[in-house]
Amino acid sequence: MKPSILFIVPATYEALKTKGIDHMIFERDEGGFFGKVIVVHPFCPKTQSIILNDCHEIYEVGFDLIPYSKRFRFLKCLQYPIHFFRIVWSTLRLVKKYRIDFIRATDPYWMGLIAYTCGRLCKIPFCISIHADYDKRMQLDKNISVSTVFGSYKLAKLLERFILPKANQVMPIRETLAVKAAANGVAADKIRIIPHGIDLTVFHTLPKNNIWQLFNIDPQKKIISFVGRLSKDNYVDAILEIARQLGNRRKDFLIIMAGGGKEEPKIKAKLASNDVLKKHIMLAGFQPRDVCIDLRRASEVSLCLMAGFSLIEACAAARPVISYDVEWHSEMVKDKETGFLLKEHDVDGVVDALDWLLNHPIESKAMGQKAKALAFKRHDLKGTSAIKVSCYSEILSQGLNH
């Protein structure tokens, strides 16, 4: 009988569909290793269950128990502890109903606390995967809620240091996060690095979309692409300044920003009031994955000043990438080999790099090919799935010995 796993994820199914990444839910069975994959989304607008197929089911717990709690602060605060116990109760029922073998939380804060509580009550193992440098993200944008508890970053850090050492396994997605996990008290023998995996087969096929026609772009324009959330932690303000400076040097480029987010109204206002930005930046909004992939392939350069999955796809598109030297970017962006890796906030350096790449198409193409080779070597789904299956097998053996 195949094992079963329960994920606890800070998301909603609707948001995943909007971002075009809902297809990744189906990758969680690791090529058929799991017979049942249950996903709990603990903080949603409404309570609902979504059956995707015989293997994959999603359960969303709505923050909707007390009427009018969104309008009144007192009712909202009253609902928090009730909601937490509601999540735990719902998760416990799912664990028993589907005979879950172990739980995986996808952050070391609320998701980790829920996994720890349910794991202990059900006497099954739990693991925590770490997907970002939350300290860095918090530094860049104080409004990021995933790394706060009741609005407090300090409380979140205390919870992180309490939860992580208690997990049966901690699975950061890269080396730098493994170092941080160890600093938070996780024993070295509990840490397993699980690189991001992406189904990259689409990058071997022909494009489905003509980007110039789709967005009504002058064919003579050289495209520079940004694909991601329009948020402070993605350095979107820097992209505007980059466009302004590059626009003072040359007129043959267009930066297409595909995505949405909190900074979108502010960016729109700046574009409306600045003729240079208006000429050289297009806000494309959220786009389907196939459009985003074809946009990357139509680009001369990808801007990934801060990126996760999007950096892998940018490299897989066989185009040079420009990134800041933060988080894990140095693993993919080899300076002057697969792109340009620049000091954080070095806007002048980014402008110089873009100008050089646009002027040197042969060298740029060679960098892009190296970037693609590296993406396939490190992050192709088959290889990363094998790593995760190995980690999961270890956890399952711990459950049997519990």
What are these regions (language model features)?
Residues 25-32, 89-93, 113, 117-121, ...:
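Membrane-proximal helix-turn-helix segments that form the acceptor-binding/catalytic region
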Residues 320-323, 327-328, 333:
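Short hydrophobic beta-strand element within catalytic cores of glycosyltransferases
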Residues 265-290:
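Nucleotide-activated donor-binding/catalytic signature segment of Leloir-type glycosyltransferases, i.e.
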Residues 6-8, 218-234, 239-243, 256:
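Conserved donor-binding/catalytic core segment of Leloir-type glycosyltransferases
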Residues 168, 294-307, 319-320:
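Acidic donor-binding loop of glycosyltransferase active sites
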Residues 43, 176, 197:
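Carbohydrate-associated surface elements
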Residues 204-217, 387:
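A short helix/loop element that forms part of the nucleotide-sugar donor recognition site in Leloir-type
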Residues 1-51, 400:
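N-terminal subdomain of nucleotide-sugar transferases
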